Amino acid sequence: MDFLRPASWEEALAAKAEHPAAVPIAGGTDVMVEINFDHRRPEHLMDLNRIGELSEWETGEDGVRLGASVPYTKIMEHLRAELPGLALASHTVASPQIRNRGGVGGNLGTASPAGDAHPALLAAGAEVEAESVRGSRRIPIDDFYTGVKRNALAPDELIRAVHIKKADGPQQFSKVGTRNAMVIAVCAFGIALHPSTRTVRTGIGSAAPTPIRATAAEEFLNAALDEGGFWDNGKIITPSVAKQFADLCAAACNPIDDVRGTASYRRHAVGVMARRTLTWTWESYRGARHLTEGAA
C-alpha cells in the first residue's frame, strides 16, 4: 500500500486523477478501522491532513461553507447557532477523541447509512462541493447517496466542502443506540423547520440502505400546517397530525434485522423520534414567535 501525502489541494486533485482508486484519509475514524480489521486494503492511501483549508469554515450572509475536515468538536463549539441540527448530531458522535478528529467529509465519503451527520444534512438541504482536475460542482444532498456505502462522487473527485444554509427555524436530532456514548446508531432522525418557505424537511439514518428523507411525511405535514394556518397562528400541533406524521416517517423506512436491532424496532423507534422531534421543534418555533410578537 502506497501512502500519498499531498501538500496542497491542487496536488491532492492531481494525485486523485492519477490514482482514482486512492482512498482519502483525514480524521481516519472510519478508514483506519476498516484497514485495521482487514476489511479494506487500498493500493493507495491519500493523507489530506497537510491541506489546512479543509479544516476551515466560512460563514456568509445566508449559509456556511464547511470544510470537509472541520472536526465535529468545532461544529459543536462554533456553529451551534447557524447549524443547530448538525451541532446536535455532532454531539452524539462516538467519543471526545473521535469528535476531535472526525468530520462531515469522512461521513459523506464513507456514506454509511449509520453516519450521524446524514440526517441533519438531509433535513437542512445541504450541498456537497466536489472537485477534480476537471472542475468543481455542487451535489444536492438528496442526490448524493446512491447505494449502500456508495455516493455520487466520480472516481477522480474529492469532497472539498459542504454548503449548508443557516437555520431559519428550529432544528432537532435524535438517535437511538444500545448505550449513550461510543455507539453506532440503531437509527437516527433529523428534522428542520423552514419558516421562510413554510416547509419541513426530515432525515433518517440507519433505517434503510441509504440515508433518506421521509418525503411523504413532509408533504403531509407541510399541507397540514398550511391548511390549519399553524405557521401564522402558532397553535399547538394536534395529536392526530403528529401521529400521522410519525406513522408516515416510520413507513418511509426500509430497515434490516442486524445485531443492533430488528427492522420492526427501527420502524417503531423512527416513529417515536419523529413525533418527539416535531413536538420539540414546533414548541421552539411557537416560543420564538411569541417572543417576537411580544417585542413588537
Task: Show the residue positions of the predicted features.
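C-terminal structural segment of proteins
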Residues: M1-A296
